[in-house]
């Protein structure tokens, strides 16, 4: 059996993620107390369900604290358990609650949305350590659905390398394990003819392909990842996220990420271009 747990901050897109899994054929349950997971999984096994997705968050109350032990117990039963932790920048969450006019689940008399977000972050600190983080601050609903499906489709028994480009002007992604800054490299943005393209397009590839500094940065990042990857593999991690940023997240970082992904193509690799997904 396979169990995907969806957790994270309110307003970060957990409902979108759960619906994406439902569309992919998972039997989905929203807001099940952590302590009820073993009993529920035994029942789903009797029913013949193989792919289960369940959201577990602060609505579970005190039982949330038992989640780490519950997850370990399910794994010892041979269940493939993975947890996706969705989050976003506080200012993004505040804006989302304002736009939707929804009430934060932890808000009450005298507690602001900002304070509710901080409280929820504290309550979920231990849960965050259990899973793969997805920063949805700059993601559209369609992009989030796509990312969730890709993560779930990856082989959970192998370490997945996630290569992610981003723009510093939009903020550093919170879900990155490594962050590299490519803003020191030549920027094709200042050439009006190159500006409309991205790092995946031939004109930008030609622009960078003969540049020594660009080649050296790619080689250095590649060497560092190759050196330390076995160490991270020993931690029984499912995912390792390597992020490269430039100013806007359109040219330099995209080009470098594409090259790194090709360099590690013999491994399980996922590619994300955070700013290219913003409008899709």
UniProtKB/Swiss-Prot annotation:
Family: Belongs to the RapZ-like family.
Key words of the record: ATP-binding, GTP-binding, Nucleotide-binding
Function statement: Displays ATPase and GTPase activities.
Gene3D superfamilies: P-loop containing nucleotide triphosphate hydrolases
Top-level taxonomic group: Bacteria
Listed InterPro entries: P-loop_NTPase, RapZ-like, RapZ-like_N, RapZ_C
Record-listed GTP binding positions: 57-60
Protein name: Nucleotide-binding protein CV_3336
A Pfam family the protein falls into: RapZ-like_N
Entry keyword Nucleotide-binding: yes
Binding site for ATP: 8-15
GO molecular function, one term: ATP binding
Organismal lineage: Bacteria, Pseudomonadati, Pseudomonadota, Betaproteobacteria, Neisseriales
């Amino acid at each position: 059996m396979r169990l995907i747990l969806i957790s994270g901050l309110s307003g970060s897109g957990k409902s979108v993620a759960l619906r994406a899994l439902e569309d992919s054929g998972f039997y989905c349950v929203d807001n099940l107390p952590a302590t009820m997971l073993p009993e529920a999984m035994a029942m789903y096994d009797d029913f013949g369900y193989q792919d289960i997705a369940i959201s577990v968050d602060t609505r579970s109350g005190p039982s949330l604290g038992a989640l780490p032990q519950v997850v370990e117990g399910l794994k010892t039963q041979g269940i493939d358990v993975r947890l996706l932790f969705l989050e976003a920048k506080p200012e993004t969450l505040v804006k989302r609650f304002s736009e939707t006019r929804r009430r934060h689940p932890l808000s009450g008399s005298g507690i602001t949305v900002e304070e509710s977000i901080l409280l929820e972050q504290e309550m979920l600190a231990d849960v965050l350590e259990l899973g793969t983080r997805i920063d949805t601050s700059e993601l559209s609903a369609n992009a989030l659905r796509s990312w969730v499906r890709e993560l779930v489709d990856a082989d959970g028994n192998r370490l997945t390398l996630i290569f992610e480009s981003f723009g510093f002007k939009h903020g550093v992604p919170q879900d990155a394990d490594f962050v590299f800054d490519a803003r020191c490299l030549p920027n094709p943005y200042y050439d009006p003819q190159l500006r409309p393209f991205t790092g995946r397009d031939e004109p930008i590839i030609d622009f960078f392909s003969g540049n020594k500094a660009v080649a050296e940065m790619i080689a250095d990042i590649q060497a560092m990842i190759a050196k330390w990857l076995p160490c991270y593999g020993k931690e029984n991690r499912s995912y390792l996220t390597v992020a490269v940023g430039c100013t806007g997240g359109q040219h330099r970082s995209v080009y470098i990420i594409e090259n790194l992904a090709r360099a590690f193509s013999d491994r399980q690799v996922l590619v994300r271009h955070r700013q290219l997904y913003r409008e899709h």
